[in-house]
């Protein structure tokens, strides 16, 4: 029996899935980890948490599925996009990673547009405007605000590609995820030498870029021992979380569109050609399908808003869920169902980490509007769900 593992490096946790060639799911496991916000608008994680979560979730999947390690024939990776992992000459993490929903880089976005020769020129180079969530502004932020750390940087990786590095020892990425760095020539599916030169970012700091289905390396002996797998298992390029999800949803041909919700909320459309929004309101990236592209819009705090609500106001439901052996979101959803559609005039604005689509504003903030004495917990829970959708 041939078994394949998919490892997704999410914002709230890492999920590993084991499937057969037929698509039958044998087992899954999720390991959660923290997110740090040392200042308003900042969002960081420790890359070591991703690696520990990946290793633990793989071991759990093998155990739960009763899977023989020798049956595992390949590993695919997906994950949260745009995050910046800075490594030194020894391949060690220099500081916590800045995430996709981090909003500290407004000044760096302006700097990028200026260096590129204006917003229109930038979009002409990489098909997208400079947005605070993207990777390139984070690189400039490190250079501008932590020069002592920037001087130590020898490699810059995306979240899933850091896990790839720990699995294979290879510095590698793939086109769908690399598109979200703002440093990829999306048309050519290669790093933009022109923009890198204008930003004075050394090309050797960036990894080799593969197509998503290409083998990017094989499992090292050290990683294999930790995961409980044989050495030499191929690890393919994989994809950014949205591109990988789109393939799973069948969004691989002209005219197909998906709407999905995780921490963020995304509308994703396949394209056979490069489709560029001159206004920069939506993103144009390489698809994880060779020779194809996609356009997408992203609301930063969709499911993330409901997670925030659970953490801040759902302690009773979380305790009850633990006692019952169910997911706390199940109880919160039942609670929300007690309020009518529209939450009787209570509205939630889900701008907990700024916003990206259709109004790119890192300073946007969330709010409840329309509160009255009539509103109870069911209204608040439902309003968060409605505001995020």
Positions of the model-derived regions?
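Active-site core segments that coordinate phosphate-bearing ligands/cofactors
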Residues: 5-6, 47, 106, 113-129, ...
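N-terminal glycine/serine-rich phosphate-binding loop of ATP-dependent small-molecule kinases
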Residues: 1-95, 107, 124, 152, ...
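General small-molecule cofactor/ligand-binding pocket signal
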Residues: 204-210, 234-236
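Short beta-strand-loop/turn "lid" adjacent to the catalytic site in phosphate-handling enzymes
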Residues: 63-100, 126-135, 164-185, 208-211, ...
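Active-site donor-binding loop signature of nucleotide-sugar glycosyltransferases
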Residues: 31-33, 211, 287
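Short, acidic/turn-prone active-site loops that include or flank metal/cofactor-
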Residues: 31, 98-105, 178, 263-265
């Amino acid at each position: 029996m041939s078994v394949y593992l998919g490892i997704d490096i999410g914002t709230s946790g890492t999920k590993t899935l084991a499937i057969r060639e037929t698509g039958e799911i044998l087992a899954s496991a999720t390991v959660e980890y923290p997110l740090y916000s040392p200042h308003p608008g900042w969002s960081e994680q420790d890359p070591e948490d991703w690696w520990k979560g990946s290793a633990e979730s793989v071991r759990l999947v093998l155990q739960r599925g009763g899977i023989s390690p020798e049956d595992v024939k390949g590993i695919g990776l997906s994950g949260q996009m745009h995050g910046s992992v800075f490594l030194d000459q020894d391949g060690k993490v220099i500081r916590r990673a800045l995430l996709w929903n981090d909003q500290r880089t407004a000044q760096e976005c302006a700097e990028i547009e200026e260096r590129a020769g204006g917003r229109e020129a930038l979009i002409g180079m990489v098909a997208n405007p400079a947005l605070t969530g993207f990777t390139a502004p984070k690189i400039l932020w490190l250079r501008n605000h932590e020069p002592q750390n920037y001087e130590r940087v020898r490699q810059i990786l995306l979240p899933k590609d850091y896990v790839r590095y720990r699995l294979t020892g290879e510095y590698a990425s793939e086109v769908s995820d690399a598109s979200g760095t703002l440093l990829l020539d999306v048309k050519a599916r290669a790093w933009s030498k022109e923009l890198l030169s204008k930003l004075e970012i050394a090309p050797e700091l960036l990894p080799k870029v593969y197509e998503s289905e290409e083998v990017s390396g094989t499992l090292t002996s050290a990683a294999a021992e930790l995961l409980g797998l044989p050495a030499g298992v191929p690890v393919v390029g994989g994809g950014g979380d949205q591109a990988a999800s789109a393939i799973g949803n069948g969004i691989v041909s002209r005219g197909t569109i998906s709407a999905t919700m995780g921490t963020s909320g995304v509308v994703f459309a396949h394209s056979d050609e490069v489709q560029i929004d001159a206004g920069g309101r939506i993103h144009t990236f390489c698809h994880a399908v060779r020779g194809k592209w996609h356009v997408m819009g992203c609301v930063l705090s969709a499911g993330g808003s409901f997670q925030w609500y659970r953490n801040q106001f759902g302690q009773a439901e979380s305790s009850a869920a633990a006692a019952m052996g169910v997911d706390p979101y199940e109880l919160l959803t039942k609670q929300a169902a007690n309020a009518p559609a529209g939450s009787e005039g209570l509205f939630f604005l889900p701008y907990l980490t700024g916003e990206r689509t259709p109004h790119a504003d890192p300073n946007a903030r969330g709010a409840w509007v329309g509160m009255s004495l009539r509103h109870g917990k069911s209204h608040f829970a439902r309003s968060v769900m409605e505001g995020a959708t």
